[in-house]
Swiss-Prot record:
Disulfide bonds: none annotated. The keyword Coiled coil does not apply. PANTHER family: MITOCHONDRIAL RIBOSOME RECYCLING FACTOR PSEUDO 1, RIBOSOME RECYCLING FACTOR. Responsible for the release of ribosomes from messenger RNA at the termination of protein biosynthesis. May increase the efficiency of translation by recycling ribosomes from one round of translation to another. Belongs to the RRF family. This is Ribosome-recycling factor. It is found in: Cytoplasm. It comes from Nitrobacter winogradskyi (strain ATCC 25391 / DSM 10237 / CIP 104748 / NCIMB 11846 / Nb-255). Keywords: Cytoplasm, Protein biosynthesis.
Amino acid sequence: MVSGSFDIGDLKRRMQGATQSLKHELGGLRTGRASSSMLDPVQVDAYGSHMPLNQVATISVPEPRLLSVQVWDKSMVKAVEKAIVDSNLGLSPATEGQVLRLRIPELNEERRKELVKVAHKYAEAAKVAVRHVRRDGLDTLKKLEKNHEISEDDEKRLANDVQKATDSVISEIDQLLAGKEKEILTV
């Protein structure tokens, strides 16, 4: 029957890895709607080292276009404020004691179109990664069939399974892209 040297489950996991990576990349695109993950790249000079913002403060989303950053240590407020301003996210903190409020500005039409292009680029990169996994799987199947480790019928059946898995993941990528595009273009 089928040799243990081909694992369709492993191929599916590798394809899902591309989807997970895409979700992370799309999550980082600023859409004009507040998200605590927007501040993930912010590094604060704290206690002699660079630390992620979420390790020195609590980030919440009290309103759709407002982020609230509650700094735990009063002495860190200025450092957090500086890190946010220096992060090139285009956010200006309004400080009230140990709480920094960040208004998320509206996106103009031109910026929305740029973000859609970036989202398409991310999705295409994910599709290419999935196709590479498919090609690796099909190459492995051809080698197994050539070495008589699996029959020609098994090779065709498994190649069909690989293609179905690929189509499924590509469809999922298209759905993620469509959702993000709708989110970006919604005013």
